[in-house]
């Protein structure tokens, strides 16, 4: 008669009469950007049938190692393309996958952006120098120095800088000539 084998994961294998083995497929967890591989361990909970005098399950576990393919999550920095002197540049970090834990991103200008768990973006403001009569605008280029956290397999900063043009607001300087009415 057939043998019914119940496994610790709830699955059941039937070994047909006259056969010595049976099998069943088990679906492993899907690949994602967070997991770093794992193992699956299954034992026999019970075995019945087969008209044996005594049917004793082997207590040893069948252990399978699930190899993980490393998936990359990228952190990209963006900013306003232009502001006027004295304006505010908003730097935004965008992740290609939501963070499971907070992500700390350190910028080349020393500022730090935190992307909260469950989110893909975080921002911080940078105050540009006030308008003055001497400077003629400039360009600010900022990159990501480091990015940590998120429980990602691999978190890679995009090396492309966030570039903002600081436009000069033209100030008029007036020169006045005065002379004494008599010499």
Predicted regions located by residue number:
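Extracellular lectin-like interaction modules
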Residues: 24-27, 37, 64, 68-83, ...
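Beta-strand-rich interaction surfaces with strong enrichment in secreted/lumenal proteins
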Residues: 11-15, 30, 111-115, 130
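Short, solvent-exposed loop/linker segments at the N-terminal edge
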Residues: 81-87, 181-183
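Terminal edge beta-strands and adjacent linker/stalk segments
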Residues: 45-71, 145-172, 178-182
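Short edge beta-strand/loop segments characteristic of extracellular beta-sandwich folds
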Residues: 90-96
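Contiguous beta-strand segments of beta-sheet-rich domains
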Residues: 2-7, 21-49, 93, 101-106, ...
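Short strand-edge motifs at loop-to-beta-strand transitions and within beta-strands
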Residues: 11, 20-24, 62, 111-113, ...
């Amino acid at each position: 008669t057939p043998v019914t084998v119940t496994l610790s994961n709830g699955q059941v294998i039937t070994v047909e009469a006259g056969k010595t083995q049976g099998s069943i497929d088990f679906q492993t967890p899907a690949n994602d950007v967070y997991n770093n591989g794992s193992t699956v361990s299954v034992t026999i909970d019970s075995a019945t049938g087969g008209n044996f005098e005594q049917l004793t399950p082997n207590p040893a576990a069948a252990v399978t190692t699930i190899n993980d393919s490393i998936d990359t999550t990228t952190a990209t920095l963006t900013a306003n393309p232009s502001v006027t002197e004295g304006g505010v540049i908003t730097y935004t970090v965008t992740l290609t996958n939501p963070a499971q834990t907070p992500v700390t991103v350190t910028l080349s200008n020393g500022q730090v952006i935190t992307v909260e768990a469950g989110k893909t973006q975080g921002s911080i403001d940078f105050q540009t120098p006030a308008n003055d009569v001497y400077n003629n605008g400039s360009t600010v280029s900022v990159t990501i120095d480091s990015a940590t956290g998120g429980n990602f397999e691999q978190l890679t900063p995009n090396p492309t800088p966030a570039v903002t043009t600081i436009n000069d607001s033209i100030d008029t300087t007036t020169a006045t000539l005065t002379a004494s009415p008599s010499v």
